[in-house]
Amino acid sequence: MLKLQLSNGQIIEVEEGSTLLPLAQKLSDKYASPIVMGLYNCEECDLQRPLTADGTVDFVEVNNSVGMRVYVRTLLFMLIAATKKLYPDVHLEVRNSLGSALYCKDNSERKLTAEDIRSIEEYMHRMVQRKEPVKLLRLPKSEAIDMACANCSDDNLALLAQVPDDTVLTINLLEGVPGYLFGPMCPDAGYVPYFELLPYADGVIINYPDDGNWQVLPPFVDQPRLNDAYQEAEEWSAMIHCNTVGKLNKIIDLGYAEKIIQVAEALHEKKLANIADILESHHELKLVLIAGPSSSGKTSTAQRLSIQMAVNGLRPIAISMDDYYKNRVDSPRKADGSYDFECLEAIDLELFNEHLQRLLAGEKVKMPKYNFRTGCREYRGNELQLQENSVLVIEGIHGLNEKLTPSVPAEHKIKIYVSALTPMSFDEYNRIRTTDMRLLRRMVRDSQFRSHDAETTLKTWSDVREGEEKYIFPYQSSADIIFNTTLIYEFAVLKKYAEPLLRAVPQSAGMAYTTARRLLNILSYVKPLEDEVIPNNSILREFIGGSVFKDAL
């Protein structure tokens, strides 16, 4: 018998080899939404996975971001299985997220029609009604590969082949269709009733509920410019044969990593030069606003873009939004009483816009400097006056929000959205989430420059994400230009820095430990890459150190 300690301290005994599913069903009335996953010794655990040792047990319900990942993973497997059943010659590839939706590209010669997509959706809803079981098999590596061969690409099989020979792998089965998707799934299709399929571009959109509101299906909001940025990155990475982890590993093994680094960095330089050309052709331009989510590389982007602007004869002048914070005593507060420095109201908008108007009128302006120690704005004698061809460059969280700069006419400003839209995936079904890549960047940077351990970064990440959802993502469609800061090789470089930090997160850290173990698992598939040849102006240097722009970071 195994002894399990529940979250309330109760000790229960279960037979070795039993699963968490009966216990989850027994405790379901204590949760506001369905339980979709267990936490077994603080690690993610499928409800159908056999238990082999004593440990602690907790449960994750669907109505949060962690539970919604299980929901979406199950939904995706249903889409894969339904498509295989109805249209065996169709091959879907999971591409990228668009709000609370996933875009899957149809890579087959026989393209899905709108009627085909309706048929697949109806088939999936019948799965829900039947509560079609999502079976879980724990198989030795060789057996798992044999089973997966029928439904896996070369990239998927390459990942399976890479794990140690004595590994026991988890393969899922839905209506006889095998799948190897990273992470737990719901026990049956009845857990995921809310979704819709929509024809989109060269494939299909799978739309699903937002985190925290699992019973409401929001309308799909198209973001064509963002999707175009994703598709451009994915097509480029495929063109240079480095769009999956397996291909990156092969490049590293063959000794071609330095070339991939050079090519990726050259792409950034080319893109920034193109943006500078657009800015130079915008003859009435007075203001460039740069915004994006955490750890997108906004500061390095602003610095490198300023250099390219100077090449074109412009005079970029940086203004820090931090210097326009209200004095701390006047700052807005959150519901818990703490200061809210992320909301737009934390900025002295009246003073900021007054200074913008005066600067654009050619006046000399005394510039403030915010003292974070005292929580007050100070004036230290710094004055600013724009010259001919001067362009203000402002980087900040609210740059895309029109309420930040209402005093500046639209013809005088350009908004740039910056984010790490990674095209890298493990295979056609297991993508690398952009939020995970940014979290790894932030964790490494916090350790390198802010003396924060990984536990601290992981515990505050949900607050960071909440701010992004509130202050950045709603405005990204208003951007005039999107710049993708991802680097095709960075996953392998971040591995070297991130793994020791993640291993140091103690089990007592709760969900931070759970996230650390999940990130360690995905990092285990990529081979490490040394960083000596990464140039000192690389956006990645903003996070790993050695940046020529260190004074601006």
Predicted segments, located by residue:
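Conserved NTP phosphate-binding and transfer environment spanning the P-loop NTPase/kinase superfamily
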Residues: 283, 405-553
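Hydrophobic positions on the alpha1 helix immediately C-terminal to the Walker A/P-loop
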Residues: 301, 305
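Ubiquitin-like/PB1-type beta-grasp interaction modules and other compact soluble beta-rich domains
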Residues: 1-76, 80-100, 109-110, 122-123
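Conserved lysine of the Walker
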Residues: 298
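Conserved nucleotide-sensing/catalytic segment adjacent to the nucleotide-binding pocket
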Residues: 317, 326, 330-373
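Hydrophobic anchor at the beta1->P-loop junction of P-loop NTPases
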Residues: 288-290
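Glycine-rich phosphate-binding loop used to anchor ATP phosphates in small-molecule kinases
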Residues: 353-411, 457-475
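Auxiliary tRNA-acceptor-end handling modules of aminoacyl-tRNA synthetases
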Residues: 49, 56-68, 91-270, 275, ...
